[in-house]
């Protein structure tokens, strides 16, 4: 057990780690397209318009996600203003609250502050958690509500009185309702598919069916006002959201992001870094002790069942695993603390060796690609960036070495392996990535030209959202490609926002009578630019170009 002094020091160090990893770099990093520019602009438009019911992007209906994740981002922008920090803070606060829930659940399970503290530390320092948790997507919000749901599930299973049991199931329903309003119907399935094997194992399946009605009612109670409001405002919303976004995306032959069954295995192995050395022992130990320790079986089901469920699905993304990193953090924390308490330090030392290997391998890979490969990551004038990347991964290896010395005594310092990467990544991104995936810099360099334009056109939805965010205007036109706005742009009041190549010159001629026109084009082949009408001004960064057509009388 931790004494009071050790608890205070641990809390201070954990808070410092959180500030350096999660908060300090937020505003300095440019927004990635299409994800971060998308969520930044959707919430900006909600705040400006006051419409918190129906999501729009570029003033075009956007039905791909429900509303609750946007609400968190909206509140963040209202508090922190028009900043990159505000765009990402919704993800950060969701991960922080998830870590607090993990601490609470670990205390409920083991009544041990040390294990609970280590579980939160491991969770916050996992590669998948901190990389997605400092990135503006909706998965951290989903992870928060799924974690809250699972805490309520365990609370309901352990409740000894009818009053407590009723309260737990009602609270579970509220958390599930928020998960549904963040990501949709699949979020409702997660607690169900986890609880079925758990309640069967603990002979509480009938009780789950009985009290589960309360969860269904409370989930409906919290979500029904928005469900009815969006149906009234946009009658077609639920048709698109259910059939296209769920049925086709999850199981259809044309599912988005289709990947093989084993896709999530390497994602998990990479995602638990810098704690990979603890994973095999934690899983095998939990499986062996599952009969005597039902909480370990609960955590195994929380991870394994959704892992298999999403592996069967055809559409896959790395971020889908985020809600299931919590149980792994708790299993590894329990295993690691038990190993240290029993002086069985082999796994803790191995974890240090793995981090040494990661640091050394990353440094060697950067040097080989940069100095030997015919296609280096960085241009010659970017030498400071790849040196910075080498320093960051060297720090990873050095910390791994410290964790492996003294028989693994300092094994918890593995959490700080990623500090160098987290603090340096924004400054170490090669210009080739900035030019293509981080449009903010190019937009800011040409902000006066863009602000002077009556019409702005882009052939990329992600870049278009970035333009709208930076210029604080949503009337961006789309050229040739509609991407994720394909459904919304088919509405009669939005069709004019799509400009097709065969009619573009005529549209341009008419538009120039009203003012300047700026066309922002993403391209790989310069021949793409030659296909456009000749502009008065052309600015390019080799991946994007701004073609400016001046006003004509």
Swiss-Prot record:
Its main location: membrane. Keywords: Cell inner membrane, Cell membrane, Glycosyltransferase, Lipid A biosynthesis, Lipid biosynthesis, Lipid metabolism, Lipopolysaccharide biosynthesis, Membrane, Transferase, Transmembrane, Transmembrane helix. Its EC number is 2.4.2.43. Pathway: Lipopolysaccharide metabolism; 4-amino-4-deoxy-beta-L-arabinose-lipid A biosynthesis. Belongs to the glycosyltransferase 83 family. NCBIfam families: PRK13279.1 (NF009784). This is Undecaprenyl phosphate-alpha-4-amino-4-deoxy-L-arabinose arabinosyl transferase 2.
């Amino acid at each position: 057990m931790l004494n009071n002094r050790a608890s205070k020091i641990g809390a201070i160090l954990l808070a410092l780690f959180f500030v350096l990893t999660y908060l300090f770099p937020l505003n300095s990093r440019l927004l990635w397209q299409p994800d971060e520019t998308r969520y930044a602009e959707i919430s900006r438009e909600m705040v400006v318009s006051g419409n918190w019911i129906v999501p729009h992007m570029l003033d075009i209906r956007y039905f791909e996600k429900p509303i609750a994740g946007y609400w968190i981002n909206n509140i963040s922008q209202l508090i922190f203003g028009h900043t990159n920090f505000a765009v990402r803070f919704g993800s950060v606060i969701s991960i922080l609250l998830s870590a607090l829930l993990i601490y609470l659940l670990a205390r409920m399970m083991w009544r041990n502050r040390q294990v609970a503290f280590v579980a939160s530390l491991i969770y916050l320092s996992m590669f998948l958690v901190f990389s997605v948790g400092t990135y503006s997507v909706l998965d951290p919000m989903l992870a928060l509500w799924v974690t809250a749901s699972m805490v309520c599930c365990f609370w309901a299973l352990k409740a000894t009185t009818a009053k407590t049991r009723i309260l737990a199931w009602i609270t579970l329903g509220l958390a599930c309702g928020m998960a549904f309003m963040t990501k949709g119907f699949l979020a409702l399935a997660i607690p169900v598919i986890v609880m079925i094997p758990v309640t069967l194992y603990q002979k509480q399946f009938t009780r789950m069916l009985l009290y589960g009605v309360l969860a269904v009612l409370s989930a409906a109670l919290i979500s029904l006002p928005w469900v009815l409001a969006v149906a009234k405002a946009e009658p077609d919303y639920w048709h698109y959201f259910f059939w296209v976004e769920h049925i086709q995306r999850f199981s259809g032959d044309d599912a988005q992001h289709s990947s093989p069954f084993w896709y999530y295995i390497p994602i998990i192995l990479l995602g638990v870094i810098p704690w990979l050395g603890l994973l095999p022992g934690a899983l095998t130990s939990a499986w062996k002790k599952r009969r005597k320790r039902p909480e370990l079986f609960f955590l195994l089901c929380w991870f394994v069942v959704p892992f298999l469920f999403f592996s069967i699905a055809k559409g896959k993304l790395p971020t889908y695993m985020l809600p299931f990193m919590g149980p792994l953090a708790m299993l590894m924390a329990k295993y690691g603390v038990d190993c240290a308490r029993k002086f069985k330090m082999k796994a803790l030392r191995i974890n240090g060796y793995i981090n040494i290997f990661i640091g050394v391998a990353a440094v060697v890979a950067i040097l080989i690609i940069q100095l030997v490969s015919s296609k280096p990551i960085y241009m010659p004038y970017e030498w400071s960036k790849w040196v910075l990347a080498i320093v960051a991964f060297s720090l990873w290896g050095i910390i791994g070495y410290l964790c492996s010395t003294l028989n693994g005594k300092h094994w918890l310092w593995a959490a700080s392996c990623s500090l160098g990467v987290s603090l340096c990544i924004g400054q170490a991104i090669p210009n080739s990535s900035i030019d293509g995936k981080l449009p903010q810099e190019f937009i800011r360099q040409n902000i006066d030209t863009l602000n002077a334009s009556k019409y702005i056109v882009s052939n990329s939805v992600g870049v278009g959202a970035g333009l709208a965010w930076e210029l604080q205007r949503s009337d961006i036109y789309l050229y040739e490609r509609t991407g994720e706005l394909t459904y919304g742009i088919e509405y009669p009041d939005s069709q004019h926002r799509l400009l097709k190549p065969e009619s573009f010159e005529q549209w341009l001629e008419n538009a120039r009578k009203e003012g300047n026109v700026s066309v922002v084009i993403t391209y790989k082949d310069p021949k793409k630019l030659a296909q456009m009408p000749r502009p008065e001004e052309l600015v390019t960064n080799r991946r994007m170009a701004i073609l400016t057509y001046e006003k004509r009388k």
